[in-house]
C-alpha cells in the first residue's frame, strides 16, 4: 500500500477517499484480508464507505463470486462507485446507495458472506462534519442491530464477519444468539493488550477458532503476522 494525498494504492487497485468521511484505515484492511471467502459466491459489504473491503474481497474471491456493496451516504457511495469502476473487478462488484437495514430486509437472494466495519465512536466525540458524525456514531444503531440485519439475508451455511474495538466486540458476543465461529484478537504492538476483535458469526453451531494477530513488533516494525495477512495488498510487502 502506498499513501497519496487523496487515497491509497494497493498492489492491484487504488482507493480514492477524498469524498468520504471515514478514510482508508487499518480496521478495514484487517477485515478485508481476514474474512473467510471460501465457498462464497454471493458476498455483501454493509456500509462499504470507500469500497475498500468490497474490492479486497473481490481480489481474494473466485471469478464466479459477486460482491454487493451498500452505502447510505451519497458522497461515499459515489466515491465507492468510482473506485469500483477503476478496479479490475468492475463487472463483479455492485454498489448501492441504500440504508443497510432496508437492503437486508428487501434482499431477494441470500448471501454466503456478509462483512461490516460498523461505526463505533460513542456520542460526545466532536466530529468535524455531520457526514463524519453519520459515519462514526453508534447512537442510532447498535452493533447487534447490524448483526441482526445481516442475519436476515444470510444463507443457511453463510458467515458474518465484523471488526470492532475489543470491548465493543465483547459486548456484542453477549448480546447475540448467533454462533461465534472465529475470534481473532488484534494486538497493535507486541506485549500490549488487544485493541480490536475480528469476529465471524454463523447460524450453525461450529467449534470456535480462536487466534491472535500482532500488527507491530517491539521495534515498531510490521510483525510477521500482519505481513502474512496483508502481503497480497501492501506494496511494501
From Swiss-Prot:
Family statement: Belongs to the methyltransferase superfamily. tRNA (adenine-N(6)-)-methyltransferase family.
CDD domains xref list: AdoMet_MTases (cd02440)
Top class in the EC scheme: transferase
Gene3D superfamilies per record: Vaccinia Virus protein VP39
Function: Specifically methylates the adenine in position 37 of tRNA(1)(Val) (anticodon cmo5UAC).
Pfam families: MTS
Catalytic activity entry: adenosine(37) in tRNA1(Val) + S-adenosyl-L-methionine = N(6)-methyladenosine(37) in tRNA1(Val) + S-adenosyl-L-homocysteine + H(+)
UniProt KW keywords: Cytoplasm, Methyltransferase, S-adenosyl-L-methionine, Transferase, tRNA processing
Any one annotated GO CC term: cytoplasm
Keyword Iron-sulfur among record annotations: no
Example GO BP: methylation
Compartment list: Cytoplasm
A GO molecular-function descriptor: tRNA (adenine-N6)-methyltransferase activity
Enzyme Commission no: 2.1.1.223
Name used for this protein in its record: tRNA1(Val) (adenine(37)-N6)-methyltransferase
HAMAP family, sorted: tRNA_methyltr_YfiC (MF_01872)
Amino acid at each position: 500500500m502506498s499513501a497519496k494525498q487523496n487515497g491509497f494504492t494497493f498492489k492491484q487497485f487504488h482507493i480514492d477517499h477524498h469524498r468520504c468521511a471515514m478514510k482508508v484505515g487499518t480496521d478495514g484492511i484487517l477485515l478485508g484480508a481476514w474474512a473467510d471467502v471460501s465457498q462464497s459466491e454471493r458476498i455483501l459489504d454493509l456500509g462499504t464507505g470507500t469500497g475498500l473491503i468490497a474490492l479486497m474481497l473481490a481480489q481474494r474471491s473466485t471469478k464466479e463470486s459477486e460482491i454487493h456493496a451498500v452505502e447510505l451516504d451519497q458522497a461515499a457511495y459515489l466515491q465507492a462507485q468510482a473506485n469500483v469502476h477503476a478496479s479490475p473487478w468492475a463487472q463483479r462488484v455492485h454498489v448501492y446507495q441504500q440504508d443497510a437495514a432496508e437492503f437486508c430486509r428487501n434482499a431477494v437472494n441470500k448471501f454466503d458472506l456478509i462483512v461490516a466495519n460498523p461505526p463505533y465512536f460513542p456520542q460526545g466525540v466532536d466530529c468535524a462534519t455531520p457526514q463524519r458524525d453519520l459515519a462514526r456514531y453508534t447512537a442510532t444503531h447498535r452493533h447487534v442491530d447490524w448483526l441482526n440485519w445481516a442475519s436476515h439475508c444470510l444463507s443457511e451455511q453463510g458467515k458474518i464477519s465484523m471488526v470492532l474495538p475489543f470491548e465493543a466486540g465483547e459486548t456484542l458476543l453477549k448480546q447475540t444468539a448467533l454462533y461465534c465461529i472465529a475470534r481473532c484478537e488484534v494486538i497493535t504492538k507486541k506485549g500490549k493488550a488487544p485493541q480490536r476483535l475480528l469476529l465471524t458469526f454463523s447460524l450453525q453451531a461450529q467449534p470456535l477458532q480462536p487466534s491472535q494477530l500482532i500488527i507491530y513488533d517491539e521495534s515498531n516494525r510490521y510483525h510477521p503476522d500482519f505481513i502474512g495477512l496483508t502481503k497480497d495488498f501492501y506494496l511494501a510487502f
